[in-house]
């Protein structure tokens, strides 16, 4: 195995004092510091009163694939390479994955210097269940892709965490109301650990209204998982009760679905029609 090694250093989200002693030592002693933004890492070092001892190179998304060979060669020649992103932990929706994978394939030592992460910070501050969760990275930029992505998450039982641009937050929340249901609990975490840190909690309906006026800063969204479904037969029975009272099937399905987060109107409607076919009930709504 090479005598060199790869270090993954978690950097502060906003407060330089959140930097760990191990990160500070690595900044001072690493032979190469591969940074998502070289200006940001130099600014951090200055705030920590540290002189970066090694060579500083950029490692952002568009150049990572081009940097892997040279950085791996340096490690194989005995260098310690430190990877840092702008804020938080490298690799998690930030550069570093390709280099980590290449180092593992080459039998190179990979070590993480743990520390800040917007994902876990938002999760624990959200007030939502945290024993099981999933991280979805950045929400898709385009509306159609975003709605399809949210539709796939509609049945997810775990709490979901994802990043979103402040410019697209309002549109994303409106799509979430449509795909997940407006009653779904959620939290918007803004500017975590910074002077203007803010966590706004409420239903997706409430948060969509809040975001409509515009939001600034770094955004992490946390959304509760889907509630356990009531038995499908019970939901169908509730729909038929509404229908017996004179309500149209589609409207009855909407009413029942709205009362059970995670249940989608169209799926329930299809289930009602299927049940009617199987039991010889009226085929038409």
Curated annotation (Swiss-Prot):
GO terms for cellular component: cytoplasm; plasma membrane. SUPFAM superfamilies: Tetrapyrrole methylase (SSF53790). This is Ribosomal RNA small subunit methyltransferase I. It comes from Mycobacterium tuberculosis (strain ATCC 25618 / H37Rv). Belongs to the methyltransferase superfamily. RsmI family. Its EC number is 2.1.1.198. HAMAP family: 16SrRNA_methyltr_I (MF_01877). GO terms for molecular function: rRNA (cytosine-2'-O-)-methyltransferase activity. Catalyzes the 2'-O-methylation of the ribose of cytidine 1402 (C1402) in 16S rRNA. InterPro entries: 4pyrrol_Mease (IPR000878), 4pyrrol_Methylase_sf (IPR035996), 4pyrrole_Mease_sub1 (IPR014777), 4pyrrole_Mease_sub2 (IPR014776), rRNA_ssu_MeTfrase_I (IPR008189), SAM_MeTrfase_RsmI_CS (IPR018063). Gene3D superfamilies: Cobalt-precorrin-4 Transmethylase, Domain 1 (3.40.1010.10), Methyltransferase, Cobalt-precorrin-4 Transmethylase, Domain 2 (3.30.950.10). The keyword Cytoplasm applies. The keyword Transferase applies. It catalyses: cytidine(1402) in 16S rRNA + S-adenosyl-L-methionine = 2'-O-methylcytidine(1402) in 16S rRNA + S-adenosyl-L-homocysteine + H(+). Induction: Up-regulated 34-fold 7 days after infection of human macrophages. Keywords: Cytoplasm, Methyltransferase, rRNA processing, S-adenosyl-L-methionine, Transferase. It is an enzyme of class 2 (transferase). It is found in: Cytoplasm.
């Amino acid at each position: 195995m090479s005598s060199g090694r790869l270090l993954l250093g978690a950097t502060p989200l906003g407060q330089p004092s959140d930097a760990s002693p191990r990160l500070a030592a690595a900044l001072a002693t690493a032979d190469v510091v591969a940074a998502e933004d070289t200006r940001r890492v130099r600014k951090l070092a200055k705030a920590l009163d540290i002189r970066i001892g090694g060579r500083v190179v950029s490692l952002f998304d568009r150049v990572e694939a081009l940097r892997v060979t040279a950085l791996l060669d340096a490690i194989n020649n005995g260098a310690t390479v430190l990877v840092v992103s702008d804020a938080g932990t490298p690799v998690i929706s930030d550069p570093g994955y390709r280099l980590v994978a290449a180092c593992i394939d080459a039998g190179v030592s990979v070590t993480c210097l743990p520390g800040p992460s917007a994902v876990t910070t938002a999760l624990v501050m959200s007030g939502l269940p945290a024993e099981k969760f999933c991280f979805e990275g950045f929400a898709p930029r385009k509306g159609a892709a975003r709605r399809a992505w949210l539709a796939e998450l509609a049945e997810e039982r775990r709490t979901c965490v994802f990043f979103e641009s402040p410019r697209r937050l309002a549109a994303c929340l409106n799509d979430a109301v449509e795909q997940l249901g407006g009653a779904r609990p959620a939290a918007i975490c803004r500017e975590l650990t910074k002077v203007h840190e803010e966590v706004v909690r409420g239903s997706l309906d409430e948060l969509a209204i809040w975001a409509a006026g515009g939001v600034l800063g770094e955004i992490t969204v946390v959304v509760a998982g889907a509630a356990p479904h009531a038995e499908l037969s019970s939901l169908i029975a509730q729909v038929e009760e509404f229908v017996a009272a004179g309500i149209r099937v589609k409207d009855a399905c909407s009413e029942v679905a709205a009362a059970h987060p995670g249940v989608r109107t169209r799926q329930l409607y299809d289930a009602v029609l299927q049940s009617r076919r199987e039991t010889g009930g009226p085929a038409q709504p």
